[in-house]
Amino acid sequence: ILAENIDVSGTVQSRCTVNVDTPGIYGNPNAYTLTTAPASAGQVPIVRFDVTLANAYFAQISYPTAFTSSPSLPDTVAWTGAVTVVQTSSSDMSGYHAASTTSGSMRQYALTIAGTTWFDATSIATYGGGQNKAFPGGAYKAVVLAQCIAQ
């Protein structure tokens, strides 16, 4: 028997995109705290999700729980933060935050309406394992993870 395999291929383009709207900056209000709070000279990062197909994606956003680069830190860093809806392109999206779920530092939103949603991700890093030790001098970087997940 003579047989032939025939390839069938295709490309799927995501109907959900993630863009940085505002980069985050850590303020240093005291020796042992780094925070994105504007009152402490920080800047809260804002991420924008653009969705052209309703009920097809989740937005997953996680505030940082570790530095991706920093001076050597021999002691513990305690992390807190929050992810919230900042603005939407439609009032029909007003229930997004109330309907969201959390797991650790990650918050997930069902993107049920086509349009644009802006989220912020605040974070506070406290050094010293509860002893409020001074952060060593140097540059610190952490990452907010924001992704579209197909439902």
Where in the sequence are the language-model features?
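N-terminal small/polar-rich segments of proteins
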Residues: 1-78, 99-151
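Short, surface-exposed beta-strand/strand-loop-strand elements in extracellular ectodomains
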Residues: 76-88
